[in-house]
């Protein structure tokens, strides 16, 4: 899948731009470790929800840039399906991209929080847990935003002695497919907390009602959001909807 992550981040934190392209994306220098660029640190853990999605378990990763000063709040970006984004040798390579862009001062010092969707543990030995991904990501409303704001982010900040900004202009969300619509929903519901969104192939379709967003955007008062939408003409077209068309209508 295309991974124009460095372009997206620069667009969100630095400038506003509109682009349309059909090509095979190739990783550029921003996605490769560069000589002389200090590397941030990654830690991994497991979060068990006790409030918003009680009983669900999920892995998380936290990226802290080398330039982070604990006496100053950093910017914050939250990634859904975080395991894929957190891999330094994966498709997105967020730790590497952040290292390079922060070093060149093309984006502010930013902590990355990478969350996998929750899993409901099995009730019997030998069974697999049940994924809670679609319920968490595709549902409209503020439940997932509350999960972040009331449970995960305060808990992780306390546990790992981290400080990030309360300014919504310095806080973003990111995701792919159902994670993309989830990232948008968080900012849509709580623009007082998050105002930057990156959506890769966002599922603005009728999986759990997300097809209503283009109409809602037209009908509701304009919100102070900066959104990067990425999709391709060969993406899904099925009973839930047409992904490329849905993303065009969002714009």
Task: Please provide the spans of the model-predicted regions.
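Bacterial N-terminal signal peptides
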Residues: 6-17
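Positively charged n-region of N-terminal signal peptides that target proteins for export
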Residues: 1-5
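Non-catalytic cap/lid and distal C-terminal segments of serine-dependent acyl enzymes
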Residues: 21-251
């Amino acid at each position: 899948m295309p991974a124009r992550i460095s372009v997206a981040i620069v667009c969100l934190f630095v400038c506003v731009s509109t682009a349309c392209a059909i090509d095979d994306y190739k990783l550029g220098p921003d996605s490769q470790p560069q000589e002389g660029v200090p590397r941030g640190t990654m830690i991994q853990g497991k979060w068990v929800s006790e409030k918003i999605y009680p009983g669900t378990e999920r892995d998380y990763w936290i990226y802290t840039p080398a330039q982070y000063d604990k006496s100053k709040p950093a910017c914050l970006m939250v990634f859904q399906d975080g395991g894929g984004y957190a891999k330094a040798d994966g498709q997105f390579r967020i730790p590497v991209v952040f290292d390079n862009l922060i070093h060149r001062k093309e984006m502010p010092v930013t902590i990355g929080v990478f969350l996998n969707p929750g899993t409901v543990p099995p009730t019997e030995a030998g069974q697999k847990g049940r994924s809670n991904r679609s319920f968490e990501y595709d549902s409209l409303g503020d439940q997932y935003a509350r999960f972040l704001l009331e449970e995960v982010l305060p808990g992780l900040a306390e546990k790992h002695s981290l400080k990030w900004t309360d300014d919504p202009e310095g806080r973003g969300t990111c995701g792919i497919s159902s994670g993309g619509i989830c990232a948008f929903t968080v900012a849509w519901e709580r623009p007082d907390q998050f105002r930057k969104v990156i959506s890769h192939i966002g599922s603005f379709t009728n999986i759990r009602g997300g097809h209503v967003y283009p109409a809602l955007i037209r009908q509701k008062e304009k919100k102070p959001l900066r959104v990067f939408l990425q999709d391709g003409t060969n993406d899904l077209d099925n009973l839930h909807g047409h992904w490329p068309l849905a993303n065009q209508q969002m714009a």
